[in-house]
């Protein structure tokens, strides 16, 4: 159950980062303020809940194991950036993502 909490904390943290990115996207001048307030408000909510879940994780998992698992954030953000904003990702970046996943598997298997 705690590992599910860790994954959910990671996903909420990523959602907060993505909301911040969305807040910076161009909108018509007459809708800009509402757009920014909406997306930054969602970012704060996601990041706040992620922090609470992260504290629960830290109560149950050694920080040396838990913290590297947040490297998943780099994977989630890359996938979301490609899907949501069609951002280009270089082969070198994908190689880095593969190394991150490999590292998470290695660290996760020690538990």
Curated annotation (Swiss-Prot):
Its main location: membrane. The chain crosses the membrane at residues 36-56, 62-82, 88-108. One of its GO terms (biological process) is transmembrane transport. Residues 57-61, 109-111 are periplasmic. The keyword Transmembrane helix applies. The keyword Ubl conjugation does not apply. It is found in: Cell inner membrane. Disruption phenotype: Cells lacking this gene lack L-Ara4N-modified lipid A and are sensitive to polymyxin. It is a multi-pass membrane protein. Residues 1-35, 83-87 are cytoplasmic. One of its GO terms (molecular function) is transmembrane transporter activity. Residues 40-109 form the EamA domain. InterPro entries: EamA_dom, Flippase_ArnE, Small_drug/metabolite_transptr. One of its GO terms (cellular component) is plasma membrane. Keywords: Cell inner membrane, Cell membrane, Lipid A biosynthesis, Lipid biosynthesis, Lipid metabolism, Lipopolysaccharide biosynthesis, Membrane, Transmembrane, Transmembrane helix, Transport. Pathway: Bacterial outer membrane biogenesis; lipopolysaccharide biosynthesis. Translocates 4-amino-4-deoxy-L-arabinose-phosphoundecaprenol (alpha-L-Ara4N-phosphoundecaprenol) from the cytoplasmic to the periplasmic side of the inner membrane. Heterodimer of ArnE and ArnF. Belongs to the ArnE family. PANTHER family: 4-AMINO-4-DEOXY-L-ARABINOSE-PHOSPHOUNDECAPRENOL FLIPPASE SUBUNIT ARNE-RELATED (PTHR30561:SF23), SMR FAMILY PROTON-DEPENDENT DRUG EFFLUX TRANSPORTER SUGE (PTHR30561). This is Probable 4-amino-4-deoxy-L-arabinose-phosphoundecaprenol flippase subunit ArnE. It comes from Escherichia coli (strain K12).
């Amino acid at each position: 159950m705690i590992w599910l909490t860790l994954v959910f904390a990671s996903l909420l943290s990523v959602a907060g980062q993505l909301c911040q990115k969305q807040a910076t996207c161009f909108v018509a001048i007459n809708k800009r303020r509402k757009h920014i307030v909406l997306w930054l408000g969602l970012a704060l909510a996601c990041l706040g809940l992620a922090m609470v879940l992260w504290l629960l994780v830290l109560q149950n998992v050694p920080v040396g194991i838990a913290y590297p698992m947040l490297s998943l954030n780099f994977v989630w953000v890359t996938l979301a950036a490609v899907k949501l904003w069609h951002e280009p990702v270089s082969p070198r970046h994908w190689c880095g993502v593969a190394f991150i996943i490999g590292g998470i598997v290695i660290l996760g298997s020690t538990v």
